[in-house]
C-alpha cells in the first residue's frame, strides 16, 4: 500500500513539474477575443512621427503586437546596444520597441532628458544603455513629455489602444480589445511564467500610477 501511495505521489509530482515546465518561458501570443458589445470610438493621433503613413497611436499598438509576436523570453540583462538583440526582454522593452518603430527612440530621448533635467531623475551616473529600460525613469519621462490621461479605469472611453500604462513596478501598452465591461486588455511582459502577452489585468491592478498617450 505504501509503495502504491509513493508511486501515485511521484506521478502527481511529475505531472505538476511537467505543467510548470510547459509554462516557463512559454508565453502565448494568441490574442483574447474582444468581449465588449458596446461602441467606443477609436482614437487616432494627428501625428505620424516616423512618416510611414500610419498615425502614432496605431503605430504604437501595431508595433507592440509585432514585438510580442516574436515571443521574447523574460530575463533582465544589460546590453551594450541598449535594445535587447537576443530574444530576451522585460516589460519596458515592449514599450521601447513599440515606440522606436513609431519614430520615438526612447534610448536617445530618455538619455537626453536625464542629462538636460537631472533634477527630475534620481540617477547618480547616467547610462544610456539601461536608463530607458527602467520603469521609474519612463514614469518621469512620460509625465513631462507625453499626453497625460486618466488613471480611472471606469472611464473606459479614455483608455485607447496604443496608450501607455504604468504601474508601480511595471509598464505596458493598452490593447484595442476589451473585456465585457469595456476595459481594455494590456499588452505586457511581466515574468517568465506569464500565460499570455495580452491579458485582462487592468481592473485587477490597484497600483496604476500613470496613463499616457505619446501624441494627440
Where are these regions (language model features)?
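N-terminal capping segments
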Residues: 22-139
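N-terminal Sec-pathway targeting helices
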Residues: 1-12, 20
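Low-complexity, Gly/Ser/Thr/Pro-rich intrinsically disordered linker/tail segments
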Residues: 182-216
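...with weaker cross-activation on analogous glycine-rich loops/strands in unrelated enzymes
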Residues: 54, 115-193
Amino acid at each position: 500500500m505504501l509503495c502504491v501511495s509513493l508511486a501515485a505521489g511521484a506521478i502527481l509530482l511529475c505531472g505538476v513539474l511537467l505543467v510548470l515546465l510547459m509554462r516557463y518561458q512559454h508565453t502565448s501570443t494568441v490574442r483574447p477575443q474582444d468581449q465588449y458589445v458596446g461602441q467606443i470610438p477609436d482614437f487616432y493621433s494627428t501625428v505620424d512621427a516616423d512618416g510611414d503613413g500610419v498615425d502614432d497611436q496605431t503605430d504604437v499598438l501595431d508595433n507592440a503586437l509585432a514585438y510580442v509576436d516574436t515571443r521574447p523570453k523574460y530575463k533582465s540583462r544589460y546590453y551594450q546596444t541598449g535594445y535587447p538583440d537576443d530574444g530576451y526582454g522585460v516589460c519596458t522593452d515592449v514599450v521601447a520597441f513599440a515606440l522606436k518603430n513609431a519614430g520615438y527612440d526612447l534610448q536617445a530621448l530618455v538619455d537626453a532628458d536625464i542629462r538636460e533635467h537631472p533634477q527630475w531623475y534620481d540617477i547618480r551616473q547616467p547610462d544610456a544603455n539601461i536608463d530607458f529600460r527602467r520603469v521609474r525613469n519612463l514614469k518621469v519621462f512620460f509625465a513631462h513629455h507625453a499626453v497625460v490621461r486618466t488613471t480611472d479605469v471606469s472611464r473606459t472611453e479614455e483608455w485607447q489602444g496604443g496608450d501607455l500604462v504604468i504601474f508601480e513596478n511595471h509598464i505596458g501598452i493598452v490593447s484595442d480589445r476589451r473585456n465585457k465591461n469595456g476595459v481594455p486588455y494590456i499588452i505586457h511582459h511581466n515574468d517568465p511564467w506569464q500565460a499570455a502577452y495580452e491579458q485582462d489585468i487592468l481592473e485587477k491592478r490597484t497600483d496604476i500610477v500613470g496613463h499616457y498617450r505619446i501624441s494627440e
